[in-house]
Amino acid sequence: MASSASKTNIGVFTNPQHDLWISEASPSLESVQKGEELKEGEVTVAVRSTGICGSDVHFWKHGCIGPMIVECDHVLGHESAGEVIAVHPSVKSIKVGDRVAIEPQVICNACEPCLTGRYNGCERVDFLSTPPVPGLLRRYVNHPAVWCHKIGNMSYENGAMLEPLSVALAGLQRAGVRLGDPVLICGAGPIGLITMLCAKAAGACPLVITDIDEGRLKFAKEICPEVVTHKVERLSAEESAKKIVESFGGIEPAVALECTGVESSIAAAIWAVKFGGKVFVIGVGKNEIQIPFMRASVREVDLQFQYRYCNTWPRAIRLVENGLVDLTRLVTHRFPLEDALKAFETASDPKTGAIKVQIQSLE
């Protein structure tokens, strides 16, 4: 099906030399207008809002995350929402004009993780923005309709925030946070802050959030007055844990949701949780770290990890639509697509105080 697109498709690229630039991107305007490249089951989305993730900055600045390496010109971005402007005739569930959030992964539907409902472990997944799969920081993208979730009248800004919300939801679900659980959140970056809001919505109490940045802790208190903030000091993991427990009023947390991936933070969380407690690592860290093994052993601490998310988007949409999780204040900076380079400079500079930077192409 053809579309009425009128602007050249542009995208935000990086490369192994750590350059960052805006250039024409695929699919071309002519292709979008004629619907030539739409495959069976696909729709064309005019991307309206895309959040900059820490991984986007990392791919730009460092060229890799673990084994995922930028080896050629590469389009960034995977936190997006937009408007459907064309649909393949085979698509019946979505129509032109629908507002959608894009789940940025395409799975094989044939491997063991896919067939058992844990498709985030798909052995042949194409995860958008993870090299070599191009990302969503483009004006137009073609994407399978099944991974385009209708958001109704939700703002595109909130629609783009559903991706990091899905990360937090996956963590809370697997960590098993229960009503009344004392919960520690390590890290007050975007994922930590959203995890905090989700833990509050799940009935966790008391809540303590840690960070090295007083500005981010202040922001956490503003959006969640119930939370107790704890500034991380240069102490041993054991001493840090004692200070954290003091912030809980002497209660040892049942669950620590670790959102930094930093070795010292993970170690402090292991020292802090109660006997039989759980440390659930949402953050991404180094290939190898040291942990206080015997502390975890003699206290029967469960240590779990997370890789992306699965089956979270419908739940995330319901949470936002019904006001249980308010993401609006997390977007602190907005830039038009044409000023994407300024957006990345803002997102990568701690001095700006940015929480979530979004690149928008609103028409």
Swiss-Prot record:
GO biological process: L-arabinose catabolic process to xylulose 5-phosphate; sorbitol catabolic process
Pfam families according to UniProt: ADH_N, ADH_zinc_N
Known EC number: 1.1.1.12
Thermal dependence of activity, per record: Optimum temperature is 45-55 degrees Celsius.
EC primary class: oxidoreductase
pH dependence, record text: Optimum pH is 9.5. Active from pH 8 to pH 10.5.
MF terms in GO: L-arabinitol 4-dehydrogenase activity; L-iditol 2-dehydrogenase (NAD+) activity; metal ion binding; nucleotide binding
Cofactor requirement: Zn(2+)
Cofactor note: Binds 2 Zn(2+) ions per subunit.
Protein's job: Catalyzes the NAD-dependent oxidation of L-arabinitol to L-xylulose in the fungal L-arabinose catabolic pathway. L-arabinose catabolism is important for using plant material as a carbon source. Not active on D-arabinitol, D-sorbitol and D-mannitol.
Subunit structure: Homotetramer.
Protein name: L-arabinitol 4-dehydrogenase
